[in-house]
Amino acid sequence: MFKNHPKGLIGAALSNIGERLGFYVMMAILVLFLEAKFGFGGTTKGVLIYTVFFTSIYVLALVGGIIADRTRKYKGTIGIGLVLMMIGYVIIAWPTPTPAPNKTLSLVFTCFGLFAIAFGNGLFKGNLQAVVGQLYDNPTYSGRRDVGFQIFYMFINVGAMFSPILAVGVRNWYVQSQGFGFNQTLPDLCNQYLSGTMTPEAMERFTGLAAEVSRGPVADLGAFAQKYLSVFVTGYHYAFIVAAVAMLISIFIFMANRKRLPDPAKKVVNKDAVAAAGAEMTLAEIKQRIYALFAVFGVVIFFWFSFHQNGVTLTYFAKDYTNLEGFVINLGFMKLEGAEMFQAFNPMLVVLLTPIVIGFFGWLKAKGKEPSTPKKIVIGMGIATAAFIVMALGSQGLPTKEALTQMGGLEQARLVTPWLLIGTYFILTVAELFISPLGLSFVSKVAPPKYQGLMQGAWLSATAIGNSLLILGAVFYNNIPIWATWMVFAVACALSMGTMLAMLKWLERVSK
């Protein structure tokens, strides 16, 4: 796979595996952790924190890009970012009491850890992508840039593939070790009971579920609610320890492979290298390239707003409306089950489908019919539109979230098949492979050399703006029919596709 690619590619890819594993352990459970620990269920507070955090990761990537571009110390910036992230994971892994005696202080402590992770990620993510792009500035490898970024992207998802399984496994193991059964809806019901907001219908369901997970009648529901919440949330805290360990491994891999990665700081003073790279771009050419990049950045905002619903509304849908009864892996000492498990499908499918997509584009290239990078992105937008239309069709007839809360949850017979989400994740993953790695390649190819880190940061900032809109997904989910929520995302992706299609010839000309 790495044949005919620069040696540094494998080091960069392996460095990213541990970091992504830790990151996606956290992202798989973050919203549900916030809801369970702080009682945010049925509100947008948890999603607001998730949105601000997810947005700041990509905004701070712009800051990280500026720092690396000015200092020319890309590898040093990346290393500091890795250490900061590990510190952040240690902070949120600390098992503070639940229910919290001082909820505000506990929330501030959690948010401080999230900020450390976000800032560290900002120093790491865009700059590592810039370094990978620099590997392909060598004319020997420049023709394989798209494939190189697809391989790099696949390795990102090798780490992410196991993250939800590890997160769910650690949490469920701890719940079982404390003598309880697992139930995804109980944390919300426990918080409703403790806050005195439970409806009579929900109370009946809560009493039944409490007896089910306790393996017998529960005499004191208040004591049960406090104990179950404490155990469930502590399981989440222990899952964050996995993220911290993964970061430690990533630091070790990066340091071991550091010498294989390019060092732009040295190239600045190497006049022969500068001469070999060709004459400086004219100001007009630089402007044209930057205009093209920002046009693409503006378009992909709406794709990321839709695609990153996997951690918000798609996870809510798995918890609230999906039949998880047969979606269980019993390992004896623990059961792998829960809404978070669906998030394993996207990275797993990326790993499985990337060689197929690379082979498909290679076959088209051999025939002289390979579409340009901008055209591939347009196709990806169309595929993403189809994914959300599938979700809308599969959600017909489901009650609103408000009605669901009053009922205390859906009866088993009314829950939808898990294949609806699995199929949607499959289609979205195909769309992602046409957009995300090729978008990175496009930025690397078009960005003026002196602004590589900045432009990679700007690409991630476009993602940040899309992420800042994630809370709208939760607002739609809580207030309009479920099928209509998915159609909002379908329309957003369709508009992105149409806009990109209108600019296609210009983008193809600039990227040549």
Task: State the predicted function of each range.
Residues 43-44, 139-152, 336, 449-458:
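Loop-to-transmembrane helix entry/capping segments in MFS-fold secondary transporters
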Residues 48-70, 161-163, 344-357:
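Central cavity-lining transmembrane alpha-helices of secondary-active solute carriers
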Residues 17, 88, 101-127, 400-434:
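Hydrophobic core of transmembrane alpha-helices in multi-pass small-molecule transporters
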Residues 28, 62-63, 158-173, 393, ...:
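A gly/Pro-rich, aromatic-decorated transmembrane alpha-helix motif that marks the paired
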Residues 80-104, 381-410:
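C-terminal ends and interior cores of transmembrane alpha-helices
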Residues 1-9, 137-146, 168-334, 357, ...:
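Intracellular loop-helix junctions on the cytosolic face of multi-pass helical membrane proteins
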Residues 3-54, 295, 304-317:
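Helix-loop boundary and gating motifs at the non-cytosolic
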Residues 70-85, 143, 363-382:
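Cytoplasmic membrane-interface "Motif A"-like loop-to-helix N-cap segments
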